[in-house]
Regions:
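Conserved catalytic-core segment of nucleotide-activated headgroup transferases in glycan assembly
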Residues: 47-52, 58, 172-174, 180-233
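N-terminal export signals
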Residues: 2-6, 10-30
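Donor nucleotide-activated moiety binding/catalytic core segment of transferases
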Residues: 227-268
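C-terminal segment of N-terminal export signals and the immediately downstream linker at the start
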Residues: 25-39, 341
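Short acidic-hydrophobic, aromatic-tinged amphipathic segments that line or gate anion-handling sites
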Residues: 83-86, 238-243, 290-299
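C-terminal amphipathic helix plus adjacent low-complexity
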Residues: 299-341
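Catalytic binding pocket for nucleotide-activated donors in carbohydrate/polymer assembly enzymes
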Residues: 261-317
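Active-site and donor-binding regions of nucleotide-sugar-utilizing enzymes
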Residues: 40-172
Length: 341
């Protein structure tokens, strides 16, 4: 396994250059406008403030006000740093950002029908047109995504052939240096039980069984818990107190149900093994960053022993540009706001 983060970032940037230029069609950043925009955000996971949280520091630096739209306050944890409001109580705004064409973003777009609209992918989407995508398409001033691969899936989700600006993932703006600890395996969960915030991914039983096999083989298990996962399922192991991307810097290998975090963990330099239930459906690029995939817990030990990073071109396609992503994203939003309010 190549653990040289600096050389890998160089390869990542070099491999991405051509693809990013084609996807962007314009410079990735521009100077922020002099005014201080007020932005409403509606996510496919209505109470999923973890998608907006990585943007708060850049918004504060600019003096922007971000507010996430939620159906109600029932699922907002005390002390959550993301400002939230219902559509009825939302503050005046200059822009509405939707992270997909699910029911909640589409409902919010209909409610705020006079606001400029931008679509920004902050998590993976199935590459199939959403039933309500047509409600959004004509209004969209711009579209952004984290990576070239994600932009292809997002285009299909929205049912559009328009150019999509690739800005990178804000979660990669401050990647930790990789310092793997001997025999430490990071287990990346998904969500076992769907709730009002979002759906679930099959494969928890396979992942639990794989963790048991690895622990029995002498591996130390550290769990990177999805924000909506049932914590009680994993309490027999150490549960990371820091985000999974940060925790991955300690691990020799990560094993989990493929999801949005997979390319980000690979960007840190940690190889991935995907636990793939037959019922799991995810975009191909999330599988492409895996060293291998397993469908039986008995395969886990060998898969971990042989885990390696994907080729640089595959990694660049799935991860997008690293560093400055929150800045590029807010720059893109700024361009969609009329110069005069």
């Amino acid at each position: 396994v190549n653990t040289n983060l600096l050389s890998r970032r160089g390869l990542l940037g070099a491999a991405l250059g051509g693809a990013a230029a084609l996807a962007l069609g314009a410079p990735a950043s521009a100077s922020p406008r002099a005014h201080r925009p007020r932005v409403l955000v509606a996510t496919n996971e209505p109470w999923g403030t973890y998608h907006v949280r990585p943007l708060l520091a850049e918004a504060a630096r600019r003096g922007w006000r971000l507010t996430q739209l939620v159906p109600d306050l029932s699922a907002i944890a005390p002390g959550d740093p993301v400002p939230v409001a219902t559509p009825a109580d939302a503050p005046a705004a200059d822009l509405l950002v939707v992270t997909g064409a699910g029911d909640w973003p589409a409902d919010c777009a209909a409610h705020f029908r006079r606001l400029p609209l931008v679509a920004s992918s902050l998590a993976y989407h199935q590459p199939v047109q959403a039933p309500r995508a047509a409600e959004l398409r004509r209004r969209l001033r711009s579209i952004t995504s984290s990576s070239p691969a994600e932009s292809r899936a997002f285009a299909r989700h929205l049912g559009t052939r328009r150019p999509i600006r690739v800005v990178g993932s804000p979660q990669t703006d401050d990647l930790p240096p990789r310092r793997p600890e001997a025999d430490l395996v990071l287990v990346l969960t998904s969500v076992t039980h769907p709730d009002g915030t979002g759906g679930a991914a099959p494969g928890t039983e396979l992942l639990l069984a794989s963790a048991e096999k690895l622990a029995a083989a002498g591996k130390r298990i550290l769990v990177g818990l999805h924000p909506r996962e049932d914590r009680t399922l994993w309490e027999r192991y150490e549960i990371s107190e820091v985000p999974s991307v940060t925790a991955s810097a300690r691990a020799e290998v990560a094993v989990g149900i493929p999801g949005t975090v997979f390319p980000l963990v690979a960007a840190v330099g940690t190889p991935l093994v995907g636990c793939v239930d037959p019922a799991l459906t995810v975009p191909d690029y999330l599988l492409a960053v895996c060293s291998s995939t397993i469908g039986d817990a008995g395969e886990a030990e060998a898969a971990v022993a042989g885990a390696a990073l994907p080729e640089p071109a595959v990694l660049a396609d799935a991860v997008g540009p690293v560093g400055g992503s929150a800045r590029r994203l807010l720059d893109a939003w700024s361009r969609a706001i009329p110069a005069a309010h």
